[in-house]
């Protein structure tokens, strides 16, 4: 007899394991299936967490080389990349084991193996020894995430031509690295290896980096990265990538038809991700996909099959771990008969470079396109006492508010701890706050958060320190 569950989650990433825990909290007999062998998905294993570890460690390496100008004399600074990688891996191991403990604590049955639909109520699980079992599910949630995509005709070998996964595991610092794609992931990984000593060239098809970001922020971001030594080749299309004895040659053509060749040791392909739906056997249950191979769902995350749901990177929307987490909680509550929902207007996005970049809500470009009348408030970190005190004052805060109602419509930050500061704006937007609500909230001094308050004051031209 097959074991029966009230709910089964296929995928143990941020969306999947959070969904499974919430389902169990709500009293459902729940199982979670993960093929990787460790929980946490791309984010924890080969994405958010290991990349943040390397971003932090590379920043510390960079800072310590410049301490003498601050009155701290140090000896010769050496990089031990092997130890750095071990530190990164240790953080990942601790966190993945922590997630497994949470499933056990909440009495979620954890299956290690590849889950696929045998029918709308049956799930086939195949482990790494090809042993198969079948379980039954009253409700199934698909949360299998996404995988990196390459360019047509270019094979990623994770040695010379790498994805973000391979870029996290290099065994030596490349002398030259080409990053194909000027999005969040490419710029994060490019900045890591730049700080560790690589000469980094970014090749981008568009005329600006970080597509979808507020263009004023994007422009300032590129200026700062250029000052840090990263070189940009905009409006360049990659034609070929050919391996050579020493690495690879990336051949491009620019908007004027000029051809360029970039020699490098490593090429990082960072041109996006695609839903990970292969091998799920969705057709056996009749689950429909859209033209981009994403699973079609309604507002409750239900597919066209009444008892099959989907969340995270396999459905429409930004491919972000925290978006998947929110959807995981919402779909669990919907399955349990509650009214789970996600406010997609308040999902932040963060680039964890130095300085950090964070955005939430609408950009100026989006508001103009929608013919929304708005007002803007900006405040530079150059006038923020905490930022100046620690000599980390590049960037600014920008708040966008409705011209009539003063309701906060969006915010964009480039500067120290932007990823933390954006949360204040998220709370404000969730509760429909105005820029004046933020401006009249007392912020501790001296803190970076005062820049948010000053930007809010600036919306009505009342900033004190600018």
Outline where the language-model segments fall.
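FAD-site-proximal beta/loop scaffold in flavoenzymes
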Residues: 157-173, 260-335
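Flexible, glycine-rich terminal cap/loop adjacent to redox cofactors
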Residues: 8-36, 42, 49, 53-60, ...
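Short hydrophobic core segments
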Residues: 8-10, 115, 135-145, 180, ...
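A conserved FAD-binding loop/helix module that cradles the flavin
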Residues: 217, 311-366, 445-466
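Beta1/beta-strand and adjacent pyrophosphate-binding region of the FAD-binding site
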Residues: 2-13, 173-183
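Glycine-rich flavin
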Residues: 2-5, 21-173, 206-210, 216-217, ...
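Alpha-helical segments flanking ligand/cofactor-binding loops in enzyme cores
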Residues: 21, 191, 222-223, 365
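Glycine-rich dinucleotide-binding loop and its adjacent helix/turn
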Residues: 48, 142-199, 203, 231, ...
């Amino acid at each position: 007899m097959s074991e029966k569950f009230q709910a089964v989650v296929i995928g143990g990433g941020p969306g999947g394991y959070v969904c499974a825990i919430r389902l169990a909290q709500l009293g459902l007999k729940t199982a979670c299936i993960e093929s990787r062998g460790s929980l946490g998905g791309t984010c924890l294993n080969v994405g958010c967490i290991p990349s943040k570890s390397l971003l932090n460690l590379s920043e510390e390496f960079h800072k310590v080389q410049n301490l003498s100008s601050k009155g701290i004399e140090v000896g010769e600074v050496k990089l031990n990349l092997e130890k750095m990688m071990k530190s990164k891996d240790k953080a990942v191991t601790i966190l993945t084991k922590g997630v497994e403990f949470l499933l056990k604590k909440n009495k979620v049955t954890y299956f290690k193996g590849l889950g696929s639909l045998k029918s709308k109520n049956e799930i086939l699980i195949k482990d790494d020894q090809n042993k198969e079992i079948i379980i039954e599910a009253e409700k199934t949630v698909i949360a299998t995430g996404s995988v990196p995509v390459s360019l047509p005709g270019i094979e990623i070998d994770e040695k010379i031509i790498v994805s973000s996964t391979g870029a996290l595991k290099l065994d030596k610092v490349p002398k030259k690295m080409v990053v194909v794609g000027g999005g969040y992931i490419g710029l994060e990984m490019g900045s890591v290896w730049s700080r560790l000593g690589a000469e980094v060239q970014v090749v981008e098809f568009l005329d600006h980096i970080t597509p979808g970001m507020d263009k004023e922020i994007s422009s300032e971001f590129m200026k700062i990265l250029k000052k840090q030594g990263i070189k940009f080749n905009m409006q360049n299309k990659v034609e070929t990538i050919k391996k050579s004895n020493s690495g690879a040659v990336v051949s491009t053509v620019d908007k004027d038809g000029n051809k360029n060749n970039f020699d490098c040791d490593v090429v990082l392909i960072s041109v996006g991700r695609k839903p990970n739906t292969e091998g799920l056997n969705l057709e056996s249950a009749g689950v429909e996909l859209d033209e981009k191979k994403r699973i079609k769902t309604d507002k409750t995350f239900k597919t066209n099959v009444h008892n099959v749901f989907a969340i995270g990177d396999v459905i429409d929307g930004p491919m972000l771990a925290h978006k998947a987490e929110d959807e995981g909680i919402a779909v669990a509550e919907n399955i349990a008969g509650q009214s789970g929902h996600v406010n997609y207007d308040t999902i932040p996005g963060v680039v964890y470079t130095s300085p950090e970049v964070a955005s939430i809500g609408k950009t100026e470009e989006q508001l103009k396109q929608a013919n929304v009348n708005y007002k803007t408030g900006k405040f530079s970190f150059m006038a923020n006492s905490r930022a100046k005190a620690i000599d980390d004052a590049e960037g600014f805060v920008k708040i966008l508010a409705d011209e009539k109602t003063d309701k906060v419509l969006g915010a964009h930050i480039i500067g120290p701890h932007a990823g933390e500061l954006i949360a204040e704006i998220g709370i404000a937007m969730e509760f429909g706050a105005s820029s004046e609500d933020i401006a009249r909230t007392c912020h501790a001094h001296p803190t970076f958060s005062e820049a948010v308050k000053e930007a809010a004051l600036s919306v009505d031209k009342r900033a004190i320190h600018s």
